Amino acid sequence: HNANIKFQIKICEIDQIKDNIDIAIIATNSLNRAILTEKLLSNVTVKNIIFEKFLFQNRFEYTNIKNLLKEQKVKAWVNQWMSSSIAFVEMAKWFGNDLQEIKVEGKNWGLACNSVHFLDYLDAITGRGKLTVKENNLDSEILESKRLGYFELTGSFTISSESGVLLHLACVDEKDLDNNKITIKMKGKRRYLEASLSLGTLKCNYYDDDTESSFKEYAILLQSQMTGGIIETLYDTNSCILPTYEQSMKQHLVLFDCFEGIFNKQLKLDGCCPVT
């Protein structure tokens, strides 16, 4: 904790903000986030922004905000925690260069809104090259989200990193079942692990050449529990462990490639993903 950082809580409209801002966290829903960002940056100078995911609903907004951030020299990151999680970093390091495939499966875990965390993980551990949709087997039916006006998807799709590591994401909908446990399987030529992620705990079995070698349990902090440390580090060092805006933009637009055809067909929306 840095005792030199002083906090002040004030609730006001954007056009009432008069002081320049060191760090802004833009945590609206995806429909309003781009509009709010434009309004904020037209009113005051902002040094750093942390966006929440899912970033924006409309494809064109990604480039517009990218250009605006560049024009105003704003540093920006997106709150995707997985690639900097101690547990997930350790899992990737255990494989070294041996990793070939990651499979993520579960029930009602929010495929549309949460896949971007796993995309950033794949992106980070494979050198942040090009990401490509290899398979798209999403169900044609869309589901209403818990938030009015937003939707979820089920089915599966596969993304490939530039180095050839595959990420397979799958989700099924089971009515009246509020079980968002996720199973994660990572496979290499010699090594394999299977992990279960649920309620802030990751339980992981590591196997080497088909022989169980170890078991480890990790505590996974909620994003809200990590925010304070992220802000303090950014304030002290002018650096951030989260993916940059442009890295996250690339990942989101890959998801647009997967999702927007279904939303266009079902909701008659062009270039739009109503996910938050």
Over which residues does each language-model region extend?
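NAD(P)-binding Rossmann-fold cofactor-contacting core
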Residues: 1-4
